[in-house]
Amino acid sequence: MPIGSIAIGAPGEASHPDTIKASLAEFISTLIFVFAGEGSGMAFNKLTNDGSTTPAGLVAASLAHGFALFVAVSVGANISGGHVNPAVTFGAFLGGNISLIRGILYWIAQLLGSVVACLLLKLATGGLETSAFSLSSDVSVWNAVVFEIVMTFGLVYTVYATAVDPRKGDLGVIAPIAIGFIVGANILAGGAFDGASMNPAVSFGPAVVSWTWDNHWVYWVGPLIGAAIAALVYDGVFIGQATHEQLPPSDY
C-alpha cells in the first residue's frame, strides 16, 4: 500500500453536508444491526431460559446477525458505503478509500449507534440487560485475539473483494450478501469461544449499557489488526498502485 494513498482530509470535510449525511447513515445502519443482533440473543434467552449459549442459540445468533448485516450494509451503501463497523472503516482508511477525518466521524457514529440500540433494547424489554461479549471459561485472551484477527481478516477481505476493488463491476446486492454470509459463518466458527465480534461497535454498546469491561480490549485489538492485514494484503497485492484510486463514498 503506498503511504501517499492515506488521506487526512480537508479542513472543512467534517462539516460538509455529505460527510454529515454519511455519518448519520452509519449511525442508523449500526443501530439497525445491533438492535436486531443483540435483540435476537435477548429474545432467545427469554424463550429458552438463558439458552443463547446452546448450539441452537449459536445458530440463531448467526442467522440474525447475517440477515441484519445484509440489511444494514444495503441501506447505507449508497450514502456512506455501509461500513457498519469501525474495523471496516479502519481497513478502508489504510487502503486510501476514506479520509482520516471522515473515518473518525464514522467511528463516533457507529459507536453511538450501538449504544443507542442497546439503550432502546433495555427500554423496550422493561430493563433487561444487554449481554457484554465475554470469553468462554477455557479460552485465553490471546486465543480470543487470534480468533478476532482471523475472523475480521475474512470479513474485511470480503469487503475489499466485493465492494472496494475498482474491478468489481456491477455486483448489485452480492456485496451485502457476501458480507452478511461471512459474518454469519464466522459466528458459527468463533461464537462459542469469544462471541465472535469482528466489530468493536457491536462489543462497545453492550459493554457501555451493562458497564462490563472485562477483556473488552480484545474486541478492539483483534478486529483492528485483522482489518489492517486484510486491507494491506488486498490493496497491496490485488489492487496495486497502478489501479489505485480514491473512491467516492458510494463505492467503498
From Swiss-Prot:
UniProt motif NPA 2: location: 199-201
Cellular component GO terms, alphabetical: vacuolar membrane
Record-level GO BP terms: response to salt; response to salt stress; response to water deprivation
Pfam families in the cross-refs: MIP
Vacuolar side: 45-55, 125-143, 194-219
Bilayer topology annotation: Multi-pass membrane protein
Chain ranges on the Cytoplasmic side, renumbered to this chain: 1-23, 77-103, 165-172, 241-252
Keyword S-adenosyl-L-methionine: no
Induction details: Induced by salt (NaCl). Triggered by drought.
Keyword 4Fe-4S in record: no
InterPro entries registered for this protein in UniProt: Aquaporin-like (IPR023271), Aquaporin_transptr (IPR034294), MIP (IPR000425), MIP_CS (IPR022357)
PROSITE patterns attached to this UniProt entry: MIP
Subcellular location, record wording: Vacuole membrane
NCBIfam families: MIP
Family designation: Belongs to the MIP/aquaporin (TC 1.A.8) family. TIP (TC 1.A.8.10) subfamily.
Protein's UniProt name: Aquaporin TIP1-2
Organism: Musa acuminata
